[in-house]
Amino acid sequence: MEAKAIAKYVRMSPMKVKIVLDLIRGKNVNEAFAILQYTPKDAAVVINKVLKSAVANAENNFNLDGNRLYVSEAYAGQGPTLKRFQPHAQGRAFSIKKRSSHITVIVKERD
């Protein structure tokens, strides 16, 4: 059985989020929480919140044992991009893309 949690429209680039997700994928849930606690990235705070939600979903909705859970899948997809312009000299303008992410964490029980 698996439980899933999704955070949508997170104002963070998916590329930056994937760096942290790669650290916890396949790890035991308790080990993943320890890794996220000491990871000096802004994405670690958001991923920690999503992982807590996935564990709570597993325990409350599917009656799974929290100590036997592991992160089976963790991925970040591209959300909508906000387009902004930075004015430059002589009437020029350069575009700025403020990217967002949809973060998904799936936990399963070890056999």
From Swiss-Prot:
The keyword rRNA-binding applies. SUPFAM superfamilies: Ribosomal protein L22. Keywords: Ribonucleoprotein, Ribosomal protein, RNA-binding, rRNA-binding. One of its GO terms (cellular component) is cytosolic large ribosomal subunit. Disulfide bonds: none annotated. The keyword rRNA-binding applies. Transmembrane segments: none annotated. One of its GO terms (molecular function) is structural constituent of ribosome. Gene3D superfamilies: Ribosomal protein L22/L17. One of its GO terms (biological process) is translation. Belongs to the universal ribosomal protein uL22 family. This protein binds specifically to 23S rRNA; its binding is stimulated by other ribosomal proteins, e.g. L4, L17, and L20. It is important during the early stages of 50S assembly. It makes multiple contacts with different domains of the 23S rRNA in the assembled 50S subunit and ribosome. Part of the 50S ribosomal subunit. This is Large ribosomal subunit protein uL22. The lineage of its organism: Bacteria, Bacillati, Bacillota, Clostridia, Eubacteriales.
